[in-house]
Amino acid sequence: GRQSAALLVVAAEPSGRPWQDRVFDLRVDDHQEPLVELARLLSVARAYHHMNEGDEQVTRGNIDAAVEEYERAETLLPGESEPIFWHAVTLASVGRVDESLPLFAEAFRLRPEWRELVPRLAPAQLLPDDPEMIARIVAAGR
């Protein structure tokens, strides 16, 4: 019956790195509506692609480009907290704390557990080691 579906998309030109050439490799093995589920998974995969590209832009110092990628991910995953949270972390990490606070508040509203992660980000060097800033972030939305 109609219980499975798959989608494999590869780069038009091989890079010599097969693990990078698979743009999407998705499958649904058992679902009542496999094409609907495959479409949902494709949206999730696209969103994570944008989040990964955002992370890559951060490492290159292109913060505005990173923010654009995180915003694209947020559009593809409405109501999901993860792209909002990492968008906020990126802004706070470059001193744009005031701009990040509404995003943190929204991420915390959607998933309160993110609030617990924030103090751990300074030791991981994902946020500055600034207790006052960390306290402002943790208090966002309260």
Predicted regions and their residues:
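TPR-adjacent "capping" and linker segments in tetratricopeptide-repeat scaffold/adaptor proteins
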Residues: 7-10, 26-50
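Short coil turns that delineate tetratricopeptide repeat
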Residues: 44, 78, 112-113
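Canonical tetratricopeptide repeat
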Residues: 52, 86, 120-121
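TPR alpha-solenoid repeat register
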Residues: 83, 117-118
